[in-house]
């Protein structure tokens, strides 16, 4: 009888322990978050870090994973050439893009959308997607939720002296928890 009582008591205490662990984790997240608001000026990056994709197009961190304890990262991309990434999947992240200027073609699953100034698009996790800048100049905000390894991904791309081969690109994507599943958009 003692064993049965012990097992019943232990089983009943599991939800309480899980709740306490969740509360402790939540408190830790709050401690690690930025405690103050902040401003990042136009043309600047959160910690003064400059990343240029292809050596030409600034991709500035506006809200860092450090600010949100990994919950969210926001970038401002200023595209100075046409083109975009290969078709890929983020298994763990949703993305949102807001077009500030220019024209962009997005592919999400089997659908394609042309976005211009003021448009927003949501890209759910686990859905193949890509985009291409159609205009000579373009600017957009985009965010990842949760952050994942995206800040490091763009640092690696920004440090490249030349465009990676498709194989090198696929490895860079894989190293940052993404999967390349097709080529960039043709336009």
Language-model segment annotations:
Residues 2-26:
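N-terminal export signals
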Residues 20-55, 159:
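C-terminal segment of N-terminal export signals and the immediately downstream linker at the start
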Residues 50-87:
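A short glycine-rich, His/Asp/Glu-containing loop-to-beta-strand
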Residues 78, 91-106:
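Short, conserved beta-strand element in jelly-roll/cupin
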Residues 86-92, 130:
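Histidine-centered catalytic micro-motifs
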Residues 111-125:
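Short acidic-glycine-tyrosine-enriched beta hairpin
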Residues 125-151:
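Ligand-binding loop in jelly-roll beta-barrel domains
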Residues 156, 160-187:
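Acidic/histidine-enriched, glycine/proline-rich intrinsically disordered or flexible terminal extensions
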């Amino acid at each position: 009888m003692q064993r049965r009582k012990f097992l019943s008591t232990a089983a009943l205490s599991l939800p309480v322990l899980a709740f306490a662990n969740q509360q402790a984790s939540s408190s830790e997240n709050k401690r690690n978050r930025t405690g103050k608001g902040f401003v990042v000026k136009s043309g600047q990056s959160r910690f003064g870090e400059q990343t240029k994709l292809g050596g030409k197009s600034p991709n500035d961190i506006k809200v860092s994973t450090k600010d949100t304890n990994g919950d969210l990262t926001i970038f401002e991309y200023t595209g100075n050439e046409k083109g975009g990434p290969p078709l890929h999947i983020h298994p763990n992240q949703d993305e949102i893009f807001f077009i500030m200027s220019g024209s962009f073609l997005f592919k999400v699953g089997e659908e394609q959308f042309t976005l211009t100034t003021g448009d927003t698009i949501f890209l759910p996790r686990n859905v193949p997607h890509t985009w291409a800048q159609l205009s000579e100049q373009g600017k957009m905000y985009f965010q990842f939720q949760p952050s994942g390894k995206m800040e490091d991904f763009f640092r690696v791309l920004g440090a490249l002296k030349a465009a990676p081969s498709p194989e090198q690109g696929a490895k860079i994507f894989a190293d940052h928890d993404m999967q390349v599943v097709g080529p960039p958009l043709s336009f």
